[in-house]
Amino acid sequence: MPKRILTLFICLLALSLSSFAAPKKSAKKAASNGSAPDKAYMQKIWDGWSTLNTANVEQYYATGPHTFFDIAPLKYNSWEEYEKGVTAILKNYKSGKFTVNDDVELHHHGDLSWGTATVKEDAILSDGKREMGTWRYTVVFENQAGKWLIVHEHVSVPAH
């Protein structure tokens, strides 16, 4: 019996000491990075798009030379270009609702996160026609000054 107690004591001591050896995240670094993007953050972005007003999503996009692919045209080379092009397209809609589905996959590595999901679209065109579909969504976020911004995005509709 005493050998068991001694063995148990040594095991508990080893476990306790090993917890001190584990690297700790700096509280300052963790706070400056904010929370990594998750499904809720992605939905917040799409809720902004549901307003059909680019001013409500601008805060999520990095400025400067970044590539964004949307349903049309082929590509945009910056947020400024994207905003101008999408604003013209959004004028054709009365309302929109975009829901990020449960198939979200997110991967985090330092100041970068990338993810994929499908997004349910339910929109009403200016002529009253209802448009419904499921879109593919790929996004790359970069942590810039503590804020996770989109530096690359791809939205597409599967071919029928």
Regions found by a protein language model. Give the residues of each.
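Beta-strand elements of well-folded, non-transmembrane domains
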Residues: 121-125, 141
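A short hydrophobic beta-strand element
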Residues: 111-121
